[in-house]
């Protein structure tokens, strides 16, 4: 199974889509309960949430014992909705930077972490770009 290979290679966690259903997620989770597993609730790209069943997928993440979920920084309203459904599970949110998600708004909506890719690795100065995103996450400003 892919999950076993990923963990054997040293990964400490895995991200899995919810749409294959509970059996698939359980089989991933049971490979190594000490590893983190995040369940994709909805996607960050335009129209990325159109075919996702947010309530059902959040319930599934709770049922299988996920560490957390993936919800889009491009739609903070979805992050807030997901947060209300998952309780203490973590939310990681892609879509900050190149896709237009706002880190501060996403954290305020309930995300625990943001995911930034191109906004850092395509920057002229990736270290400065990373620092900029870090400073934006202080919601006390």
Predicted feature residues:
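Conserved anion-binding
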Residues: 1-76, 88
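A C-terminal functional module that forms or caps the active site or interfaces directly
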Residues: 73-120
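Alpha-helix-loop-beta-strand connector modules within alpha/beta enzyme cores
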Residues: 27-42, 80-98, 133-141
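C-terminal helical cap(s) of enzyme catalytic domains, especially alpha/beta-barrels
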Residues: 28-31, 104-141
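Short, acidic/turn-prone active-site loops that include or flank metal/cofactor-
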Residues: 18-20, 42-46, 95-99, 118-122
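A general structural detector for well-ordered alpha-helical segments in enzyme core domains, enriched
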Residues: 2, 24, 28, 57-60, ...
């Amino acid at each position: 199974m892919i999950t076993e290979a990923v963990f054997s290679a040293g990964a400490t966690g895995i991200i899995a889509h919810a749409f294959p259903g509970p059996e698939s997620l359980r089989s991933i989770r049971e490979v190594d309960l000490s590893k983190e597993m995040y369940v994709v609730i909805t996607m960050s790209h335009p129209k990325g949430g159109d075919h996702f069943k947010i309530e059902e997928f959040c319930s599934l993440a709770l049922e299988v014992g996920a560490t957390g979920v993936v919800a889009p920084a491009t739609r903070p309203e979805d992050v807030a909705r997901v947060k209300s459904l998952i309780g203490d599970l973590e939310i990681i949110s892609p879509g900050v930077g190149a896709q237009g998600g706002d880190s501060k708004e996403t954290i305020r909506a309930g995300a625990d972490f943001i995911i930034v890719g191109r906004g850092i690795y395509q920057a002229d100065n990736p270290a400065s770009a990373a620092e900029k995103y870090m400073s934006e996450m202080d919601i006390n400003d």
